[in-house]
A protein has these predicted regions:
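A charged, aromatic-enriched C-terminal amphipathic alpha-helix characteristic of glycosyltransferases
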Residues: 141, 157-192
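Short alpha-helical donor nucleotide-sugar binding micro-motif in glycosyltransferases
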Residues: 87-92, 184
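Conserved acidic donor-binding segment of nucleotide-sugar-dependent glycosyltransferases
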Residues: 79, 132-144, 153-158
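Short hydrophobic beta-strand element within catalytic cores of glycosyltransferases
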Residues: 117-121, 127
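Donor nucleotide-sugar binding/catalytic pocket of nucleotide-sugar-dependent glycosyltransferases
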Residues: 1-27
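Conserved donor-binding/catalytic core segment of Leloir-type glycosyltransferases
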Residues: 30-48, 54-57
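Aromatic "clamp/platform" in nucleotide-sugar-dependent glycosyltransferases that forms part
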Residues: 100
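Short alpha-helical segment that forms part of, or immediately flanks, the ligand-binding pocket
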Residues: 86, 109-113, 127-128
């Protein structure tokens, strides 16, 4: 919408490619070690809003710190390397990302590739089938209702733990091979012709 309205670029000249992920890079386990924990994996900054949810006891945080309101003494796991992410993301029950403006964050596709369900803000729903039970969308008008958010995280985690193979199947549409074939190459062909 922004490209069409603010920049006045005609729709036939817009070629938007969704994020893709190397699904084969992620280790998968059916029985995660931290299945009763959720992971909020993102740069810790004000826009990502991690500080709002630190009172949720089963929610753990990973990412580099850029928010002085965030208490690093509460469930903070440090910054993860890509290798650590590939190996360990599958060990959590689900992923939480309640930021205020990312449309199609890569970390969501990474969570799917590791077999995790997601709890996301309404801003992060682009290209997702939100009818899937392992995708929980928190409405913006409920984002400060910590009890509600916690209940939704637990509900999603309980469902996701028992439906990991369905999540892995869903993740395949975001695999780089599929994204390149379905979106990137057709866009290049249109530009060339």
């Amino acid at each position: 919408k922004i490209y069409k309205t603010l920049l006045d670029i005609p729709e036939e000249r817009l070629y938007i490619t969704p994020n893709g992920v190397n699904t084969e890079a992620f280790r998968f386990t059916e029985l995660p070690i931290f299945g009763h924990h959720s992971i909020y994996l993102a740069k810790v900054d004000y826009r990502k809003r991690q500080h709002l949810f630190q009172s949720i006891k089963t929610l753990y945080f990973a990412g580099n710190i850029a928010d002085d309101k965030f208490d690093i003494e509460t469930n903070y796991l440090g910054e993860w390397s890509k290798e650590y992410l590939y190996e360990n993301l599958t060990e959590y029950g689900n992923l939480v990302l309640l930021s205020d403006g990312e449309a199609h964050p890569l970390v969501i596709m990474e969570a799917f590739a590791a077999g995790l369900g997601v709890v996301i803000s309404e801003f992060a729903t682009a290209n997702l089938d939100v009818s899937k039970e392992f995708i929980t969308v928190i409405p913006e008008n409920k984002i400060h209702d910590i009890k509600f958010v916690e209940e939704q995280i637990i509900k999603n985690r309980d469902f996701s733990i028992n439906n990991r193979h369905a999540i892995i199947d869903y993740s395949r549409q975001f695999d780089w091979v599929n994204v390149i074939q379905k979106h990137y190459l057709p866009a290049i062909q249109k530009v060339i012709s």
